[in-house]
Regions:
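Short beta-strand to alpha-helix junction loop
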Residues: 64-84, 99
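Gly/Ser/Thr-rich loops at beta-strand to alpha-helix junctions
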Residues: 9-12, 73, 131-132
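Fold-independent oxyanion-binding glycine-rich loops
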Residues: 8, 32-34, 128-130
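Positively charged, amphipathic N-terminal segments that serve as targeting/anchoring signals
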Residues: 53-54, 73, 82, 86-94
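N-terminal Rossmann-like FAD-binding beta1-loop-alpha1 element of flavoenzymes
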Residues: 1-29, 184-206
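N-terminal FAD cofactor-binding segment of flavoenzymes
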Residues: 11-67, 75-76
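Predominantly flavin-linked oxidoreductase catalytic cores and closely associated redox partners
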Residues: 87-205
């Protein structure tokens, strides 16, 4: 089966990795407009390393600073899943875009355009996750644990904090925003959604 994944989110990488780990033979292509996975200037919620079993499988892809604590930054998880997926055969096409010209038939632009013919057919297409809805959370990376907030030690002398109110402190290095119900569950929920889609697809093939 030829599978096309239309973004490089944590959810989509979890989908790809679940398909790959199923033992089924599939050709998976992932499209990204970025130059590399996890490349973002915005702060996104991290997670505990033991929050999902899939994270244990990418532990060896984590930077050394991550080994000292239990907290994993969002970008570390993102890159770790990508490295593991690529090592299992995922084809990621960076700086690329795609248009569907007919049902299941796509045209590729950018670097992916040189890898494919004029048009390519795929048996299954995994679409990007819908935009989050819910509460607006304010995030911050700071040089100290912030009072009256749940701050997570990032392992390098900085702390990550998410709050429903704006965070103001002299030691803040970076601000961020995230929309959803619970920042501490953001990574786990994305992984679960990807796994669920993959299991649904695999079940339909039996």
């Amino acid at each position: 089966m030829r599978i096309l994944v239309l973004d490089d989110s944590i959810r989509s990488l979890a989908f790809s990795l679940t398909i790959q780990n199923s033992g089924a033979t599939n050709e998976i292509h992932m499209i990204s407009e970025k130059t590399e996975v996890g490349l973002s200037d915005s702060l996104k919620p991290g997670t505990n390393r033991d929050s999902h079993t899939m994270l244990q499988g990418i532990d060896h892809h984590m930077p050394k600073v991550a080994m000292a604590g239990s907290f994993l930054r969002n970008s570390w998880v993102h890159r770790g899943l990508a490295i593991e997926s690529v090592s299992n055969g995922l084809n990621i096409h960076f700086r690329s875009a795609v248009n569907e010209v007919d049902r299941g038939i796509f045209e590729f632009h950018g670097t992916a355009g040189s890898s494919f013919g004029v048009s390519e057919h795929f048996d299954y297409v995994s679409h990007p996750p819908q935009a989050n809805v819910g509460i607006l959370w304010h995030g911050a990376v700071s040089t100290k644990s912030l009072a009256a907030e749940v701050s997570r030690d990032r392992g390098d002398g900085t702390f990550e904090t998410w709050s429903r109110t704006q965070i103001k402190d002299s030691g803040i290095l970076q601000h961020g925003r995230w929309v959803g119900e619970e920042p501490n569950e953001a990574v786990v929920m994305a992984i679960r959604e990807g796994v669920t889609e993959a299991i649904r697809l695999l079940s339909s093939l039996k």
